[in-house]
Amino acid sequence: MPFGLKLRRTRRYNVLSKNCFVTRIRLLDSNVIECTLSVESTGQECLEAVAQRLELRETHYFGLWFLSKSQQARWVELEKPLKKHLDKFANEPLLFFGVMFYVPNVSWLQQEATRYQYYLQVKKDVLEGRLRCTLDQVIRLAGLAVQADFGDYNQFDSQDFLREYVLFPMDLALEEAVLEELTQKVAQEHKAHSGILPAEAELMYINEVERLDGFGQEIFPVKDNHGNCVHLGIFFMGIFVRNRIGRQAVIYRWNDMGNITHNKSTILVELINKEETALFHTDDIENAKYISRLFATRHKFYKQNKICTEQSNSPPPIRRQPTWSRSSLPRQQPYILPPVHVQCGEHYSETHTSQDSIFHGNEEALYCNSHNSLDLNYLNGTVTNGSVCSVHSVNSLNCSQSFIQASPVSSNLSIPGSDIMRADYIPSHRHSAIIVPSYRPTPDYETVMRQMKRGILHTDSQSQSLRNLNIINTHAYNQPEDLVYSQPEMRERHPYTVPYGPQGVYSNKLVSPSDQRNPKNNVVPSKPGASAISHTVSTPELANMQLQGSHNYSTAHMLKNYLFRPPPPYPRPRPATSTPDLASHRHKYVSGSSPDLVTRKVQLSVKTFQEDSSPVVHQSLQEVSEPLTATKHHGTVNKRHSLEVMNSMVRGMEAMTLKSLHLPMARRNTLREQGPPEEGSGSHEVPQLPQYHHKKTFSDATMLIHSSESEEEEEEAPESVPQIPMLREKMEYSAQLQAALARIPNKPPPEYPGPRKSVSNGALRQDQASLPPAMARARVLRHGPAKAISMSRTDPPAVNGASLGPSISEPDLTSVKERVKKEPVKERPVSEMFSLEDSIIEREMMIRNLEKQKMAGLEAQKRPLMLAALNGLSVARVSGREENRVDATRVPMDERFRTLKKKLEEGMVFTEYEQIPKKKANGIFSTAALPENAERSRIREVVPYEENRVELIPTKENNTGYINASHIKVVVGGAEWHYIATQGPLPHTCHDFWQMVWEQGVNVIAMVTAEEEGGRTKSHRYWPKLGSKHSSATYGKFKVTTKFRTDSVCYATTGLKVKHLLSGQERTVWHLQYTDWPDHGCPEDVQGFLSYLEEIQSVRRHTNSMLEGTKNRHPPIVVHCSAGVGRTGVLILSELMIYCLEHNEKVEVPMMLRLLREQRMFMIQTIAQYKFVYQVLIQFLQNSRLI
């Protein structure tokens, strides 16, 4: 080259490093933390990071400040980019966290965490010499500080540690002897405070400091309009002016001031009453700008919140007592300002208008309850004098209400304390337009029984529409009186944690920490009859199962720790085989404790989703085994089949099923490949099944089979062909359809190109374990009290699928057929048979569409068969009515079974339901009644009570932290159950929903509704569809990614990854959606709902096992439907009552519903839903007795 240039290619321009910077923040306890931010990050985001570390919610009292290049304290302008602000004004990128807005009394501070940080700030003010105090005051304050930081006097052998502890202000120059004498006096003061809780000592310390000269003041040197040098100060009552010798000249109250501005280097304070302007001059323009904006911010904050803005008659000062507790702390207390002695004690009323302060991202004074029981961070270490930073007398001045959410795993959840209920929250007018018509008067019991005997009252459908929301006093919270509550002890459980014990006594006693156990691990000894365990089809692998850890547990130990559900009943007569007779079982549903354990497998997507979650991610399908052929053959069974083959089979099966519905339930035949049904007895031999093993963590509803996916396994079919009993009537099918189905090839169809391990939800594939073709799952479809179909797989053909795999798209199961028909044939792989016989199948589908209009009365019977056919299963044999009928005389019904059934049959539940109050008599709805929160509720009459509502960390968009959700806590038999009952998210509240899930540490979401029902939106879809772009969506500060979805007959299980964008933390959330609830009424298939409850319990146990060793070991489960009261109440009440049945607790359904409604109004909206709970309990008892 002519130019001797050598270009270095080793250096890279790191864009990420150029866009980020690290800032240090010194906390009030002198610890320093680091925060990595982008160059565009504002001071607000940095403050949120600090709030996350401190688990702080009431950030509107706090702020960040720095030392300027002239060593003056300056507050950060939170709305501006932090890096640019620090580069321009700061001496170094070091921030200080502190209190910005002081209050006249500590009772303004609602949270314990807020009070602790406030205590650290005022103690720092004392030790740094900002407040003038006498030696007696110093000793008294030092004694309280030692009690607050170290505890009682008798915990230490000697008081020598006090010599290393900073006790006195830094500017107090003391000789060694005097210092020793004062230290001994502090030790005596410490001993006098023995027995006072640290939190109480902190409050007493703050109370003492409030009376010191200079408390909460910030002073700037200026010149008045006459050129005299004065001190211009600001505090929580207003602005004051002092001369250089400290004499008070004048004080301007907040109500006396209008605008506060600046003109060049002059500060202008407009006085309203005097119609004049006070002028103060500074050295430069920047200083005048800073002071004027600071004063304007303080003025706006205090005036909007009515803190010390009006004169009021305050009660006399409260005398300090040794047993003084925080709950007895007065809400109003005078503040004495030396030497003026101005009293200020009036409480504020909250306002909710936005503020455009340069210092605050959002500085509304909103006081919210804490959901975290925050332990105080005591100063147990050694602090030297040099560790306390000495700064200008600046007291923190920042207000923000959005936070980086703390990791729920590390948070200590508890019930929020009572808010101070203010009259300002009460709406001034009634919204008459939203009040529904009054509830229909309830007839007396005799009238009801008389109508029932006459056949007038239909127990299944009576008053379903009329028994909807009974909202006759929806505005009971519009009361004119002021409601003031004292702050409760935040370390204790709160009164609405309701115990539910066997004695039937329901009181609001507090729950001790020892009682706060996982309901699933809290085993209550039961009666001998209840503890007898029989190995049935639900336990085919227990002998070879290995639990968590390295222990080998016996079956009894395993059941003791995990509280297994009793499996569904054996059929009658009992099978003779020793292994589970899967081919002849007639379970109504195959759920987590049913014989489908040996056919479940671990999906590839589950492994990538979460290694520890594989025991729960499963193919929990309730399937019906319906083989179409029964000839002897030795064929290789391929695991994977094309979507076209299976969906074409579905279309043929629907046509066949449609015609079969014309016949009586027990008289349906199966379409055989050759000839009519053979005559013979109903008994047959079934080959035994091989054993399968796995060593992953298991639960009663989630057994999985680990098998290789690297090779196709072959197994010969058994030689024996079971005989099918002769039925009285034969079903006739189209000859063309029979011919088409008979020509189904035995060889597997061509596979899809590309990855072989991921198919859509509509595609089915064989299990990934080596299974004989005769192996299958069984179930019974319940269509009525005395009607049932027994279905089993006896000799499956080569095309019978087994289960659903993880999908790349998320179609509804009922729409697979329509989707396949709409897609062009050339775009889908098709098998040979169906490409030839497509016209025949389509002709049958046309016939089906014509006959569909005649089948409206049988819709409830047809739907389960259609879903079973869509799962790739077919009817193999149908036993007669004699076999299917459950002999009630053989069921060992106990007293509870008879009592529940009697109530249901005699209609006693109707009167029982009507006598339960719809909601709490004196419920408070302060936050929910605010105008800005009206649009956050789906139904404005259904809102949470104030004392147990879920409180979010306030943000700019939601400055009250409101969401229509309630904590539901009930203690049953010593075990605490914790739910969050909430409404289905609205389009504009999805980010609030995910914020709640994150902050409350939720790992399981139970959704008891579809997104749309009957053309109406029930719940906005708040999670991304599988197969959408990256399967991810962002909701506010959270990114949600769908990892997999598994559909069963009546519910769908979805695995989600939730990432907090600000902190980068991720968490797994399980989404369980019940999909079988009809548009009106309740599910007809009670056993299906029971299987859904078992699925929830299984996932709960798994997620809780992942939280061992953390503070939040038992997070709540979010349950929601549309309004969050009807179906949500059914699920919660059913699960609680089943737990009572399992542990021989007294079953009081109306009493439990009453307790639930005291925590969330209108739980269980209709009598039909209430009756359905009884049906669920009866079915559960029936299952448990048919072992």
Swiss-Prot record:
EC number(s) recorded for this UniProt protein: 3.1.3.48
Chain residues that bind substrate: D1079, C1121, S1122, A1123, G1124, V1125, G1126, R1127, Q1165
Residue numbers spanned by region Disordered: 510-531, 671-690, 787-824
CDD domains assigned to the protein according to its UniProt record, in alphabetical order: FERM_B-lobe, FERM_C_PTPN14_PTPN21, FERM_F1_PTPN14, PTPc-N14
Main localization category: cytoplasm
Biased composition annotated in UniProt, kind: Polar residues: 510-524
Pfam family, one: FERM_M
UniProt induction comment: Up-regulated at protein level by cell density. However, at the mRNA level remains the same regardless of the status of cell density.
This protein's name: Tyrosine-protein phosphatase non-receptor type 14
Membership in a protein family: Belongs to the protein-tyrosine phosphatase family. Non-receptor class subfamily.
Catalytic activity: O-phospho-L-tyrosyl-[protein] + H2O = L-tyrosyl-[protein] + phosphate
